[in-house]
Amino acid sequence: MGVSENSAVAGVSAQWPARLWVVRHGQSAGNVARDVAESNGATLIDLEHRDADVPLSALGERQARALGAWMAGLPEHERPTLILSSTYVRARQTALAVARAMGQPDTAVSVDERLREKEFGVLDRYTTAGIIATFPELSEQRKLVGKFYFRPPGGESWCDVIFRLRSIVGDLQRNHVGARVLIVGHQVIVNCFRYLIEQMDEATILAIDREGDVPNCGVTEYAAVADGQSLELVRTKFVPPELADEPVTTESDQPAGAR
């Protein structure tokens, strides 16, 4: 069945936004610091901010502007009518860049704490090597139960993130039918939305995760099918042409540093 911007056909009530984009934030200073720490074999990631306050890097700012330019270049009737963002600084900066590129005020961006990064608890700021050295029992537990179900002390599992995103999906279906919605979040947020919208199981989404990271400012796009009863994947991991040759942040969903 083809996709459509119409909210309903043949008297059937639509249940979804007409268009949905789920985007990872631009490269952050935490991404850079984590990659340096991992490559140097360090135990801890050197960050001056708490995770929620980590800003975009200079490259991340450029990526956010490029994403905004791409969105602003869409025909007006195809641009987002609603922008939702994680409360984390790097995501809000990315969302604001898009809003400004489209000539919208900063107030056009609505922040929602349910879109925040997965919380890593006691493992926050530790590198992979640091976790193995400092928390060997947790490292073994993660291997045993798998990343989908593993919850570090004080942190979240993928299931916990999915649980909070289910309520956002419900909001989209109740309050934003026929709208064009842009969501700016984090890598695990993108993957968990895919799990929900495409009705995946654990094995399927983890196989996708193993294929590689979601690019910074990478776009996963859905369109409502003709009757509005479901969403169809249009593309995933798409980056605006200006960003096509940029490096992708390495390490998939490691419990360390800012994602």
Each model region followed by its residue ranges:
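Short, well-ordered beta-to-alpha junction loops that form the rim of enzyme active sites
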Residues: 25-26, 85-89, 114, 165, ...
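Active-site signature of alpha/beta-hydrolase-fold catalytic machinery across serine-
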Residues: 97, 192-196
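Glycine-rich phosphate-binding loop signature in dinucleotide/nucleotide-binding domains
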Residues: 74-79, 172-179
